[in-house]
């Protein structure tokens, strides 16, 4: 009987977490991480990779909302924004992309038409201009704290990785880190798309991330399941294995 009770107690938090997940369409699902933070997964076709699930985040404070990354297109982004409005009773006012790729800024055009303010690494802004993509309005170089009606969203550029311009966003009131595509999930075994990566800098960037956010409760990667700080070291192992395999004569 005692064994059964312990097993039920261990499973109960998982059941509670599962109850906080919702599928709002065939290609978008949302999971609540805390009272104010949600992570979403959008499924879309990415050239050369097939159907890919991509993560982003929704942060809520006093009926205002911030999106960290968008789905890959305007249609999915509109669906997500409408869900935030209708289900969370919040207006999306703020957008912060992880880097310049489509699975981060694909819906920026729609957000701009809605008057949403966007904040990005200046490198992301420059790359978006160069490639003829929608361009975020407000840039920073090393770090920027964006206030969501008093709730700090701390943006940091700590170096190149999956992309030369990738950042992380820290939510200090929630102890949640959005690492984006710089980080791999625990099930990942491949380095993935490195067409725009700075592979040499990547391990050093990860060391900075690990040192800066040792207390993160949740760490959310760009693709795959969220976890804890172990994702940082796991990603470093994958990158180092790739570097070693490609440096052999």
Swiss-Prot record:
It is an enzyme of class 3 (hydrolase). Residues 1-18 form the signal peptide. It comes from the Bacteria. One of its GO terms (molecular function) is beta-lactamase activity. Its EC number is 3.5.2.6. Zn(2+) 1 binds at residues 99, 101, 162. It catalyses: a beta-lactam + H2O = a substituted beta-amino acid. GO terms for cellular component: periplasmic space. Its main location: periplasm. GO terms for biological process: antibiotic catabolic process; response to antibiotic. Zn(2+) 2 binds at residues 103, 181, 223. Competitively inhibited by 4-morpholineethanesulfonic acid (MES), SB236050 and biphenyl tetrazoles (BPTs). Also inhibited by chelating agents such as EDTA and 1,10-phenanthroline. CcrA is not susceptible to inactivation by the beta-lactamase-blocking agents clavulanic acid or tazobactam. It is found in: Periplasm. PANTHER family: ACYL-COENZYME A THIOESTERASE MBLAC2 (PTHR42951:SF4), METALLO-BETA-LACTAMASE DOMAIN-CONTAINING (PTHR42951). Confers resistance to the different beta-lactams antibiotics (penicillin, cephalosporin and carbapenem) via the hydrolysis of the beta-lactam ring. This is Metallo-beta-lactamase type 2. The lineage of its organism: Bacteria, Pseudomonadati, Bacteroidota, Bacteroidia, Bacteroidales. The gene is ccrA.
